[in-house]
Amino acid sequence: MNATHILESHEANEQHHATNRSYWEVTYNILVIMSIVFSMATYLILDKDRFEKNPLLRFAIILLPLSCSAIQYLFLLYTNWKSNYEPEGTLHKALYYFFNVLLIAFAIISILSIIVLPINGWGNESDIAIYSVILPFFVVWSVDLVSTINDLTMETVHLIDTHYTMLFDLMMIITIIVNPKYSSQGYRYRQSPTPSSSRSTSSRTTKMRIVLLIIMLILAISMYAFIAWKCLTFLRNMQGKKWCN
């Protein structure tokens, strides 16, 4: 009787957790769509002079995408720590902890950008286009890429040594680029019932799959390195002006 009650309580908790996760994903996807649509619509509708004169407008444009970025990375980091998952093997441990460091770095860059980027005057039209059109889209896209890569380090994800899944890999990357609103949960790699998987308990990856993962990682790192460079350049210029005065 007690065992049955405990099992039912556990199933109820699991169902409640899954429901909360579903609500979170829906809310996050809505915020992502709003951030991209709002920034692009603002860029197309308003005069470019208003961006330079109104810091609140600049803040409103980058607030949603960078907030979504920071929240998602912190959520992924929290999920990794809460899972109590211990990676096996030196290479797997290095990869796992490296991704956790990346999550922290990307979250810090996102928060810093919310504070620093609106202060900059966005003096030319190229800056306005970068911050209001290109930045929101690529920030959201990079979040999905990093979320997918991060999933590959977890215990529940397995990769298989088959070449036909290369098509799925390419379709996943193209779909994320074209439709960044979709959650990375739908693109997780799962183990498939193949002869190779039945012969071995551990999954192996092909060289081409590893190359794709490296490309995804480089794209995400490049995006946030660019944002960090813009922030540091602006802070350095501000410091130089103070010394001149």
Swiss-Prot record:
Family according to the record: Belongs to the UPF0328 family.
Name the record gives this protein: UPF0328 protein ECU09_2010
Native species: Encephalitozoon cuniculi (strain GB-M1)
